[in-house]
């Protein structure tokens, strides 16, 4: 954990002795094999935490040891969940604004497409623009020493002026992200208007959802809808989605114990 750099937490450790004590006078090759190692967590490089697998070779000497390390990146694949319900929520102000939004499902693989719609039931405010964002929230540590960091990975900006743009995020983070701004609405919406949503996830740097990994950290994703009126007032609603890594075509299915994607 980056805020606790002095401590490292091992969750897996296997050791093999490749050669008995002796003299090494010329180049020599030693073979090794760690069989059927269960790697229960996926590799992760976040804002405040890093989970890594690596091979370490150590040559013990009377003086300083010679140590070399090689990182291994581990993916954890899942199969699609049997139950995948849609998300339906609304946001509004009494007698001024009432908007309903719907997403076709709540769990997505990392190359999936988010399909949904925004439906305006009541509009008595002049909406300047809307934003649809994917937010990653990383929680590390345990209470009372718990840290929460949020970063916006994707932001679709909807305005009454067509300005496709690329810009840097406004928050301070150790990770550099890019915002993608696209127009999906021209002018202020009227009552009964429906705006479709179609967001392709494959082009963005996303990880699966992680929950209580080794009781050290969690990573969750949220779809955030924000509306801003002419007076710069903001109305927003967030809904959690679950992301998982789908096994490539032709790869054997994930293990049975990983079949069901957990639901918060």
Regions found by a protein language model. Name each.
Residues 1-264:
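C-terminal beta-sandwich interaction modules and adjacent acidic
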């Amino acid at each position: 954990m980056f805020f606790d750099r002095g401590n490292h937490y091992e969750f897996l450790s296997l050791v093999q002795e490749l050669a008995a004590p002796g003299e090494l006078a010329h180049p020599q090759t030693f073979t090794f094999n760690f069989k059927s190692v269960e790697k229960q967590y996926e590799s992760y490089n976040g804002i405040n935490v890093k989970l890594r697998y690596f091979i370490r070779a150590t040559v013990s000497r009377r003086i300083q040891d010679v140590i070399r390390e090689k990182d291994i990146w581990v993916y954890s694949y899942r199969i699609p969940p049997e139950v995948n319900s849609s998300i339906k929520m609304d946001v509004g102000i009494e007698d001024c604004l009432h908007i309903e939004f719907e997403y076709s499902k709540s769990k997505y693989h990392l190359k999936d497409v988010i399909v949904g719609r925004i439906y305006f039931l009541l509009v008595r405010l002049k909406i300047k623009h809307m934003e649809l964002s994917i937010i990653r929230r990383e929680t590390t540590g345990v209470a009372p020493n718990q840290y929460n960091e949020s970063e916006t990975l994707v932001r679709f900006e909807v305005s009454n002026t067509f300005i496709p743009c690329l810009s840097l995020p406004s928050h301070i983070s150790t990770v550099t992200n890019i915002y993608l701004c696209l127009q999906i609405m021209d002018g202020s919406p009227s009552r009964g208007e429906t705006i479709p949503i179609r967001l392709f996830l494959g082009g963005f740097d996303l990880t699966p959802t992680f929950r209580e990994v080794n009781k050290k950290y969690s990573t969750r994703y949220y779809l955030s809808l924000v509306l801003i009126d002419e007076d710069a007032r903001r109305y927003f609603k967030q809904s959690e989605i679950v992301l998982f890594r789908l096994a490539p075509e032709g790869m054997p299915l994930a293990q049975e114990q990983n079949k069901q994607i957990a639901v918060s």
